[in-house]
């Protein structure tokens, strides 16, 4: 199409609704190029950035854009930074949606209200650039479609938010000032293919730059590394295409360096190798470099060679130089296993959106490096670019630091009914082909990319089959994966289910999810299985994570998975008081929205880790431990195994300690020298005290590396050798007199001991007062509790207008557990010689149905210790409760807490493998986990002793407990929608639980707490002792 087209014709033509038009005049995509003229030339000599402030005008629909907008006076315009999303700068609104389209779905058509923004800026190029060669502008990310003008001349059009759009400006540039103008539409028919679970935002959100190309230049090049079966001979093939003028006599010189030393080189002319019976490509160079005993790239050892490619004239003058880091490695599926360099991989992966809480899609390099270092420090080795190609710099960093990458096409039609409505329609094949073939062409030279993905949640259509075949013919070096259509269709080389469970089948009318164990055993199924999504970390989650890793280690064809997902997508926003808070769906009055479903990362939006990250790091660690005991059960030795596939232990120091209750008995260090898969047996010294309780082991880096400092802990383990630390439960001999009084004025049983007083209300049977020297300890009575402030996993998919009756929260509410009627069955008191006993029995009912019965014995001894013994029975058929415990509101002004139990971080019964038993001290506020959507949080389990303020609580008869101490009541946590709205209450809320349900986390939309972590018994017993420390 000619460039001479009026603005009105562009508006009327509606390219953004034409299903077969994806671009006008956009240049073919290629691998990243710098077009340098010498080996050490500064990039700024061939690349000019157009990032910065652009003039900006916003319109609610494209038909409102004035015809002369590109010629308007820029001094009267608003300013918009590039890169950015305009919704984060006061225009329009972000929309968070998981599945539903943010507009009426009628492909390829779009609503008239289609927000449109017009960007303009002035730039000036070096006059030398205008004398010869070409000048191209590259927009690396624009959502969702745009038209481009230069100096009033229409240049072209492009779609696909996540891949570069390059245009030739050469003919329309002038000396001096040039005006570039871009009209960006929020929605296009491409938006039907960009229905990912994310904030929907728009704008120019990646770099914009102008590049100067020589008159004759390298148009693209493709690298291919081949290894022989012994992996000691490598061939690197470079296929380069040249474009421009008079290139028939040009030469290509390739040189390969490792650690600044040249290891191979070759010069070549245009290839005469025939492609088919009609002959060779007339613009292709082919070079082959051979290596003996190459250093092989892996995520563990990311060895990179530097390849220098020079385009030369016939006389040897340099026209263009490109430098690129390359990795030599071999990816294959063999014998049912995904292998790298001949060894099976175990994918320790995470999904990752491009997201920044302040900048939206505009993620900068500093944040990318921060993410990669955090991944490496927490034992990740892989990342899935969910669900679109990332910024080009991301792949370079993954090459450098060492991460395996699944590169995913920008295709998701989750909101279509059926899901494959578009992907099965040949009309949309060109659009889909654009997104797949351009991704592969741009990114194929990165060693970190080991798998291509056809997209996400788009059903299974004929177009997928066509694109799968294209990739398999175009790139022989990588497998292809795709989950849509059931995770095991003909267009995936790997079974890639979402949220399949280890042992439980999930039967659906279409595309059932088999258990992992069943899937790999299906008749005729020989492919490896890697979960493309699992372990949904929404809020307080990731319970049962270890079951997956036990299965991964047991069954070779279960080769890991990608956790959902990396970082909470909470956008920083100001509340009515001007304070920052993290917003989720609906906070911008966005419709439709999926509320807090965007808060499902391992990191909070500020990229601080959630407690669940400890569990992930533990199960993904590269060193495995095993304790050996003799027939008498005594620990004699332990082994440590190097679970790396390629990396020898040479920079790791093992440290182990054996601790008794009061001292460190043994403290030793060993510098490890272990080959991959090799184990070391470490014998424990004999003659240890029989009271030695714990064996603590950790492995740390001796020297710092690219992602962690010296001394950084990469693996840990703890074994209980004997009885755990804890109180003896011995009652101190008491001489003080304790008395029981029935106070008719207050209708209480009153126990007095020196200046302490306990009061039990006769009409409620509750401990309603505990004072010392007239200072009250309780603000509210000590009560049974069976519920928790609901987790996201408890709520499931329930909404105000859509209730999921299967969700735990709905079950608990339907059973009346949040509104139980308490009935005192009996209360009696007994004076003993050195103690007072209070016995109570309560029933808890809903609509005359008794759900729980609780019997308690309070023994208050003359030494001031109150022993509480509780027996709870559950009615048949009621929903399993969240907890069996007691709670009260304390008057103490607590600042510090110490306890002996699992810690130091938050842990729950199904998420405590990483927690270690010990004595922990912290501030009260450090017990709180600031989940953006408030819920139950802050638990510490397996506690034998707890001290706070002037209080001490101890386990009784070796039955440990869990506790919470919080400035927020359970009721407030359940009621408030955002953490910034929580109000610290007077005093502190204490929960002491004998039993707690797990948190679950296989997914967040169906009950996922494993049976062994449910409170499914009909009877529970627990006890503890409570006293003041200042008696």
Curated annotation (Swiss-Prot):
Q: Where does Na(+) bind?
A: 197, 597, 600
Protein name, entry field? Beta-galactosidase
Q: What organism is the protein native to?
A: Oenococcus oeni (strain ATCC BAA-331 / PSU-1)
Give one GO term, molecular function aspect.
Answer: magnesium ion binding
**Which gene produces this protein?**
lacZ
Listed EC numbers: 3.2.1.23
The site feature described as Transition state stabilizer is recorded at 353, 387
Question: Belongs to which family?
Answer: Belongs to the glycosyl hydrolase 2 family.
One GO cellular component term noted in the UniProt record for this chain: beta-galactosidase complex
SUPFAM superfamilies recorded = (Trans)glycosidases, beta-Galactosidase/glucuronidase domain, Galactose mutarotase-like, Galactose-binding domain-like
